[in-house]
């Protein structure tokens, strides 16, 4: 599994705080800086399920597996890619809030692109289905 997270750092924002928001929900192996029209982009990447463990833990801690699964399912692109966004300001305080509409996150979201051989296993691992508030199948981490 390969994961890339892209987050915009606007001119009015502190890069260290944006990086903290990213690292509260993601454990990157590499972070690159790229110029953009409204500031800079931080492009973080890694391989393996471990880099999404913070995001998974937050989803489970908040008890939002079903809501997360719904958003993630809508972000499936093709047979091997899932694209989704989380609110940068919420991530800064360690909370996961999915962004579903353009402009919903005023300072821009953190956008994740996950490439995996098994999208269903990824969904079952990150945000499994629940029944009456309890997870009834916990998949092993994907490739």
From Swiss-Prot:
<dbReference type="Pfam" id="PF01877">
    <property type="entry name" value="RNA_binding"/>
</dbReference>
<comment type="similarity">
    <text>Belongs to the UPF0201 family.</text>
</comment>
<protein>
    <recommendedName>
        <fullName>UPF0201 protein Tneu_0685</fullName>
    </recommendedName>
</protein>
<dbReference type="InterPro" id="IPR022803">
    <property type="entry name" value="Ribosomal_uL5_dom_sf"/>
</dbReference>
<dbReference type="InterPro" id="IPR002739">
    <property type="entry name" value="PAB1135-like"/>
</dbReference>
